[in-house]
A protein has these predicted regions:
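A SIS-like phosphosugar-recognition module
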Residues: 1-210
Length: 210
């Protein structure tokens, strides 16, 4: 793993490990935490499920509390984004504790508080999204999701959820790589392009012109 290859040293007494898990029972995550703690690391976990194995292994816990402790649906994207929000808040807290420049912290926190309203706007467009899905998805056997930067992370999450719900093998690539593959297919491409505008959005469109 990346940890064993680059960060796993014999003495980790000056290391803070942040473990992220929805259920707190993921075997590879918990084994990694055990290994880091055995070498002196301090562990803070971001987790949804209270009383889970991961919470017992952690020196500190930040609960996301994004609903039921036990995940009832594999398509629970809210757990993923709650973890991202918790990670940002923890990063700000750590930066403040060490006296780092927090820059536009207040602006960011205000944007975070506005997320519920933004989500309501997206959910209000479900009917339009359904029409698009019904028109295009059945006509294409091959699907792919693309994105860059922060949108690449969102693309990976979308790929996982679509694969779980639709029982399809779905690719996830960086936008600029798309023109080099799928040469024998005419795929349905879902583009994660939140926040892009102007020439950057135009460049993304050019990259996808297979």
């Amino acid at each position: 793993t990346e940890l064993s290859g680059f960060r796993l040293t014999e003495d980790m007494t000056e290391t803070l490990v942040i473990a992220i898990s929805q259920s707190g029972t993921t075997t590879d995550t918990n084994r990694t935490v055990d290994l880091a703690r055995s070498r002196g690391a301090v562990v803070i976990s971001i987790v949804n499920r209270r009383g889970s194995d991961l919470t017992d292994r952690s020196d500190g816990v930040l609960y996301t509390s994004d609903g039921r402790d036990v995940e009832m649906s594999v398509a629970s994207t809210k757990a993923f984004y709650a973890q991202i929000a918790a990670g940002f808040l923890l990063a700000f807290a750590i930066a403040s504790a060490v006296g780092a420049d927090l820059g536009d912290r207040q602006e960011f926190l205000a944007s975070l508080r506005d997320l519920p309203t933004a989500m309501e706007v997206v959910l209000s467009r479900r009917s339009a999204a359904r029409v698009i899905a019904e028109n295009f998805a059945p006509a294409k056997r091959y699907w792919a999701v693309v994105g860059n930067g922060r949108n690449r992370i969102a693309a990976q999450e979308i790929r996982i959820k679509l694969s779980e719900l639709c029982y399809k093998s779905i690719a996830c690539d960086a936008t600029e790589d798309k023109k080099h593959i799928d040469l024998s297919a005419e795929p349905l491409i879902l583009v994660c392009a939140a926040g892009l505008s102007g020439s950057i959005a135009d460049d993304v469109a050019k990259e996808l012109a297979i």
